[in-house]
């Protein structure tokens, strides 16, 4: 029973959806990847425009509208937030105990809880959560190759300065694609070591760190082997850099991109109206 519980804990890693594409046929899937990437970047910028409860409520509402528009289950987006929830809480706690200003509720040594700290802790928590959610909307509805094409288009002006935009876009898309692969391989290694009696869940922080250390070597070796296999496959298919290459899939703007642009303009307009100046 204990072994089954540990396996279930480990299976959480297989549910991480960072970098995973989930097939679908909703409005968001029909958007041009360039439009999705641009809207995602601008949406993250808009999150930082919010500075009071009304504006945070507005941008949260629009974020959930985007999630609903994907047609995917809420569990998908929860799995996107869950791996980083500890980091979000930690960042919020730093704001809570070290941010000063307003009415002080509690104070001890260098720590204090004030009205300004509570407010900022809540805002930081919402802000990071929304950034992860809207980024998840982008990654689960867009194939890695489409993300690469969108990044290449977005970075195209840098070609004037001789920046290798095509290669940068390819590297980023490959990195996104191999995030879930690394998680899956980590899970396999952990399960193999559990079958040999390894325990990754019991003990303090130092003991857990020592238990995880043996995973790093085989994971590093597997990453190198995967990189070599990928480079060999690309070279065998005649890849010599992206310069001069044609596109199999031609990207075209559609009415769905105009709808999303109007959606974003409405969001920014509401934020500018209701934010505290």
From Swiss-Prot:
Which InterPro entries does the record associate with it?
A: ABC/ECF_trnsptr_transmembrane, EcfT
The membrane-topology field of this record reads: Multi-pass membrane protein
Pfam families (UniProt xref): CbiQ
Q: Which keywords describe this protein according to UniProt?
A: Cell membrane, Membrane, Transmembrane, Transmembrane helix, Transport
| TM region(s), chain numbering | 39-59, 61-81, 85-105, 121-141, 163-183, 254-274
Cell compartments where the protein resides: Cell membrane
Signal sequence range: none
What's the superkingdom here?
Bacteria
Gene Ontology, cellular component aspect: plasma membrane
* Molecular function via GO: transmembrane transporter activity
> Oligomeric state and partners?
Forms a stable energy-coupling factor (ECF) transporter complex composed of 2 membrane-embedded substrate-binding proteins (S component), 2 ATP-binding proteins (A component) and 2 transmembrane proteins (T component). May be able to interact with more than 1 S component at a time.
Function, in words: Transmembrane (T) component of an energy-coupling factor (ECF) ABC-transporter complex. Unlike classic ABC transporters this ECF transporter provides the energy necessary to transport a number of different substrates.
- Similarity comment text for this entry: Belongs to the energy-coupling factor EcfT family.
Write the protein's name: Energy-coupling factor transporter transmembrane protein EcfT
Q: Which gene encodes it?
A: ecfT
């Amino acid at each position: 029973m204990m072994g089954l519980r540990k396996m279930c804990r480990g299976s959480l890693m297989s549910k991480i959806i960072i970098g995973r594409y989930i097939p679908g046929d909703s409005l968001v899937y029909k958007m041009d990847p360039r439009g999705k990437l641009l809207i995602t970047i601008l949406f993250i910028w808009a999150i930082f425009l919010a500075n009071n409860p009304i504006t945070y409520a507005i941008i949260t509402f629009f974020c959930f509208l985007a999630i609903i528009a994907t047609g995917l289950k809420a569990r998908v987006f929860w799995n996107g937030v869950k791996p980083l929830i500890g980091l979000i809480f930690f960042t919020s706690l730093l704001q809570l105990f070290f941010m000063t200003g307003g009415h002080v509720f509690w104070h001890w040594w260098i720590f204090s809880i004030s009205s300004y700290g509570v407010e900022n802790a809540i805002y930081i928590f919402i802000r990071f959560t929304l950034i992860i959610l809207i980024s998840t909307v982008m990654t689960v509805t867009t194939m890695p190759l489409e993300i690469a094409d969108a990044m290449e288009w977005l970075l195209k002006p840098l070609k004037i300065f001789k920046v290798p935009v095509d290669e940068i876009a390819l590297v980023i898309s490959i990195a996104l694609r191999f995030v879930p692969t690394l998680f899956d391989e980590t899970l396999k290694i952990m399960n193999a070591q559990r079958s040999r009696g390894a325990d990754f869940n019991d003990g303090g922080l130092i003991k857990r760190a020592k238990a995880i250390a043996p995973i790093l070597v085989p994971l590093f070796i597997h990453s190198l082997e995967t990189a070599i296999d990928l480079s060999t496959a690309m070279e065998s298919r005649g890849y010599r850099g992206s310069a001069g290459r044609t596109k199999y899939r031609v990207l075209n703007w559609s009415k769905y991109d105009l709808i999303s642009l109007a959606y974003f303009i409405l969001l920014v307009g509401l934020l500018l109206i209701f934010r505290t100046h």
